[in-house]
Amino acid sequence: REVVFFTLGTTDLTQYTIAVDRVNNRVANMFRPTHPAVIRIMDMTITAGERENIPTAICGEMAGDITLLPLLIGLGATSMSVGVHLVPIIRYAIRNLDYGQCRDMAQKALQAPNSRFIVDLSTALARKSYPALFE
């Protein structure tokens, strides 16, 4: 109603949600953009946008990570903002994903107990969908 699009900056979202500064050597190893709290916030934002026909773009490091694309697409993200050098790779990956499989996997990820489980789910679907990018 008030906006025409949402953009989720995943790096800042992660940093502020789980209170971990990725450049602080003492805590940088705890920086996890797939932390269940981060994924749930992303889902709530995207779902709110969908209810009002507001598209949600993803920017930040997650958008260019081919292992996490199935998760982002499954959550309902409508576009990825990546560096120009990644555009062909991300486009290829997205074209090879099955939306239904991504949605099913994302629903499992939303119930996940930890970041590793979420990464494993998304990576498995990515490897199945575009194996050539992992060679």
Kindly give the residue locations of the regions a language model identified.
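Non-catalytic helical/linker scaffolds that mediate oligomerization, partner binding
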Residues: 1-135
